[in-house]
Amino acid sequence: MKQRQLGKNGPMVSTVCFGAWPIGGGMGKVDQTQAIKTIHSAIESGVNFFDTAEGYNTSEMVLGKALEGKRHNIVLASKLSGEDHSIGHIRNAINNSLKVLKTDYIDIYQLHTPQPNWPIEDTMSELVKLKQEGKILHIGLSNYSVEETISATACTSIQSSQPRYNLIFNNEEKATLEFCYQNGIGIMAHSVLAKGLLTGKYKAGHIFEEDDERKLFNFFRGTLFDVINKLVQELNGWAIERNRNVTQLAIAWVLAQRPVTSAIVGMKTLDQVEQARLSSEWDLTQSELGEVSNIIGTFKPKWVKDPVS
């Protein structure tokens, strides 16, 4: 699998990053043995980049087990989750992550979401100390707006940013991507398949299990789902004409966007690993990108997560 450098002076990472949210149970129950097999299959396919988080349920624990004996070849990214950015919690969080991941350092340690109640200067100062201590190698951000990114970079250098970015939901992140590109900050795009929506797998009226967080997203139900699903089917038809499918198209499209270093793809099965591998090998031409853009047109929905009424 191809690799790209993450940021100005960061590590070389595979163009597909293994997104470990699903193996933590965020999208329903996952058999741990199957999850570990999937992780090993991804490594065999050339994936050297793994993204997890403190808040991904059992994800760090499963990943830690799977990477035993393989850690030296892996670029590992995790995140400080939750609303507490106090010095004490940051210390507890990194130590817990190191313990369950069975490692003594994390390559990219990211702030999962902005927390305006905590001064960014204090938070970044503590991350710099962790870097000096060797517990983390690089600092990253996740889900930060361009204004929030600018504030963070005023405190210290940032290696990566992790915005939500995909074929359908991409309008709100453009300013962040451009700032990062101009300032040598690597982009790890998440939700490239829109939580599975861009696979074409889900039909109208699909009911998610109680332990599947996707039941909270507005685009999996109602009129918005119908509109997006119709578009996904059209994109799938276009991809099939090229002996591909819409899953591969969605990943390849993200990788074709100039600022993107790596596309984070959630994987729970061996087939999903294979789809990701095939996607990484598809270099969309400018002509093809234009055709895809014409299919999508001016449709720019907003990403909303809310309680199901």
Give the location of each predicted region.
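Acidic (Asp/Glu)-rich catalytic clusters
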Residues: 7-10, 64-72, 95-102, 131, ...
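Beta/alpha (TIM)-barrel catalytic core signal, keyed to glycine-rich beta->alpha loops juxtaposed to Asp/Glu
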Residues: 114, 118-294, 299, 308
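Active-site groove signature of glycoside hydrolases
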Residues: 98-119
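N-terminal binding-site loop/beta-alpha segment at the start of enzyme catalytic domains
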Residues: 1-74
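Hydrophobic residues in well-ordered beta-strands that form the structural core
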Residues: 51-52, 76-78, 141, 187-189
